[in-house]
């Protein structure tokens, strides 16, 4: 019976991921075919679809690398961070997951995210600021949250949408005017691929995997404080991966609002404290 429930849950999770992936790519397909049709009618629409297909193929192949490069992340070895590897191995074993690749971003802001096309190709990236800010229990909770995204099949639609947003907004570095048009399209791609509900689920599943909801709540408080002090500038590349992070890396104003996908901190803390048996 338990195996049947696990299988049903996995099928549902895969179906949900597929639906979010389709929703994420539709805006690009519509944009390319619409522009093509406006320029050259039916032939242009077909050409636009061909362009969209090429972009999707390239993005699918390199989406995780695009996301990691946006944060200047580099692979980290076990020699450099043996304790980080130990925690990830323990949590992966507890969650019956392959051990993900580990990366570090030089950002001083405390944050983290997971990318990949499936659990076997998953990677977790932590910022230098995260490792400097959290104690072991808090870091364990954050890593549990990221692994919950892996087990929940959230990675493929979220990572592909990050890659698509990076590709869509890249011309903005050359012509800021294009960003006025392409920025909302990239934001729509991201919003259709993720939901706040997935963050709540990752918080709960990650806290249970790590065994300490209070520690994850403490980590979120520190991360939010770090973001307030060291908010990143919402440039095109970073904006395209902001939805992957455990907390938004931006001040919630201006252009960054387009890419806001994270639930309110207060509600995340309330749910984690309820999970731990606390009452406010």
Which positions does each model-derived feature cover?
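Hydrophobic core of alpha-helical transmembrane segments in multi-pass integral membrane proteins
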Residues: 27-34, 52-53
């Amino acid at each position: 019976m338990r195996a049947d429930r696990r299988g049903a849950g996995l099928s549902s999770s895969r179906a949900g991921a597929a639906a979010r992936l389709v929703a994420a790519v539709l805006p690009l397909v519509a944009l390319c075919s619409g522009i093509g049709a406006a320029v050259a009618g039916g032939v242009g629409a077909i050409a636009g679809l061909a362009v969209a297909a090429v972009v999707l193929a390239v993005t699918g192949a390199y989406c995780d690398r695009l996301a990691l490069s946006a944060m200047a992340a580099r692979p980290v070895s076990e020699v450099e961070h043996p304790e980080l590897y130990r925690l990830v191995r323990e949590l992966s074993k507890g969650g019956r997951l392959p051990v993900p690749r580990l990366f570090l971003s030089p950002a001083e802001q405390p944050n983290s995210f997971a990318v990949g096309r499936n659990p076997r190709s998953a990677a977790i990236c932590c910022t230098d600021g995260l490792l400097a800010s959290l104690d072991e229990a808090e870091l364990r909770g954050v890593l549990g949250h990221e692994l919950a995204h892996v087990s929940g099949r959230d990675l493929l639609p979220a990572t592909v949408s990050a890659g698509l947003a990076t590709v869509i907004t890249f011309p903005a570095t050359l012509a800021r005017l294009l960003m006025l048009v392409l920025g909302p399209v990239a934001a729509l791609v991201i919003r259709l691929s993720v939901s706040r509900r997935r963050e709540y689920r990752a918080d709960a599943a990650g806290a249970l995997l790590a065994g300490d909801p209070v520690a994850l709540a403490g980590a979120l408080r520190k991360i939010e404080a770090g973001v307030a002090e060291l908010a990143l500038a919402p440039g095109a590349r970073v904006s395209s991966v902001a939805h992957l992070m455990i907390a938004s890396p931006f001040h919630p104003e201006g252009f960054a609002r387009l890419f806001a996908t994270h639930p309110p901190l207060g509600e995340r803390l309330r749910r984690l404290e309820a999970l731990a048996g606390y009452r406010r």
